[in-house]
Amino acid sequence: MLTFMASDSEEEVCDERTSLMSAESPTPRSCQEGRQGLEDGESAAQWRSQDSEEDHEEDPDRYVCSGVPGRPPGLEEELTLKYGAKHVIMLFVPVTLCMIVVVATIKSVRFYTEKNGQLIYTPFTEDTPSVGQRLLNSVLNTLIMISVIVVMTIFLVVLYKYRCYKFIHGWLITSSLMLLFLFTYIYLGEVLKTYNVAMDYPTLFLTVWNFGAVGMVCIHWKGPLVLQQAYLIMISALMALVFIKYLPEWSAWVILGAISVYDLVAVLCPKGPLRMLVETAQERNEPIFPALIYSSAMVWTVGMAKLDPSSQGALQLPYDPEMEEDSYDSFGEPSYPEVFEPPLPGYPGEELEEEEERGVKLGLGDFIFYSVLVGKAAATGSGDWNTTLACFVAILIGLCLTLLLLAVFKKALPALPISITFGLIFYFSTDNLVRPFMDTLASHQLYI
């Protein structure tokens, strides 16, 4: 699932990201200062309104573009192109890093390519000589796996709809604990064993403890944005490696195709669970839990100013009970708030508004299944680099097209269908057509 979000300026001093950020109430002002500020604000507003009316009379369509006052024609398109290219880079880097970690592990650590077990969600084995029976077992495994995903997604949406936040946080914290401590311990142990690096258990436990503790703080509380993004990429790679190891070969490919179809239905259907989750979060003006979403920019959730198109560009601030208490001075008289005016063309506020960027949010499930596809291409079949690179390029092309559609439709879109479809097409075509062709050329010592 891929969505846009409002973000802070690139020049913002704060470099931390958190799901809960406190908003400070403005300092109470005296009655005289408030009245004086109100009079000054009214005079400035009248002067600006008269000036804008004169400009509007000269050219009515001068500063009207897509319903945004104070923005000349063509600027919206330029911003879309600018942010579109930036968003592509913002998502290409983490997706590429996640897939590189998975492929590098698959190519070097034999533990994740050895088949010595299956997940409980895929109980049917594929070790049968009959092709039909193997295909049937893979379809049955896919049905069970997709059913589990659907049930758990609906359960999560119901919990969020009825505001069971503590239960959801406990669920996510438990999952993060397993990934950051148990799976990291297994991963680090296998890597050290592969490269024949000796390490005593106290040092190993201390390393895993430090890694997991910092990750829990960054993901579920607050910390540097780059560090949180790195932890989200790492836990996605660890989860993808588990799927690559324990999913049967044919079942993995059928599951990838089925999960892309489910993602399409869950996000675009009016009653789809993921769409209901996003709409509920937007109605409540709340962020989706950071343990489920990778965000490319800072998220401000409390005290964040919101531009409401229905108010004709006026700056809307969320209601804060503390502000209501602070609006009265020590004598019990109300103090007059400052007057907020939208930035007009030619004023410094417009530059600040243009510098604001919108971030992109991509679900961690998309990272996981992207990496599963590339990792399976590297681990199964021939496992040559041509097939792996073809799947890698296909996923990036699909992600780029998805971002293009996101810029056009400006709503939450599924990120799996296009990328997974391209990846499957590139995998089977490269593995069955390109690889035999190149092997034949190499055997005859012909080079193109």
UniProtKB/Swiss-Prot annotation:
The protein's name in its UniProt record: Presenilin-2
InterPro entries reported in the protein's UniProt record: Pept_A22A_PS2, Peptidase_A22A, Preselin/SPP, Presenilin_C
Source organism: Sus scrofa
Residues on Lumenal side: 109-138, 188-200, 245-249, 383-388
Location of the region described as Disordered in the Swiss-Prot/TrEMBL record: 1-70
Any one cellular-component term (Gene Ontology): gamma-secretase complex
Cellular location(s): Endoplasmic reticulum membrane; Golgi apparatus membrane
Disulfide bonds listed in the record: none
Function: Probable catalytic subunit of the gamma-secretase complex, an endoprotease complex that catalyzes the intramembrane cleavage of integral membrane proteins such as Notch receptors and APP (amyloid-beta precursor protein). Requires the other members of the gamma-secretase complex to have a protease activity. May play a role in intracellular signaling and gene expression or in linking chromatin to the nuclear membrane. May function in the cytoplasmic partitioning of proteins.
Gene: PSEN2
Domain comment quoted from the record: The PAL motif is required for normal active site conformation.
GO terms, molecular function: aspartic endopeptidase activity, intramembrane cleaving
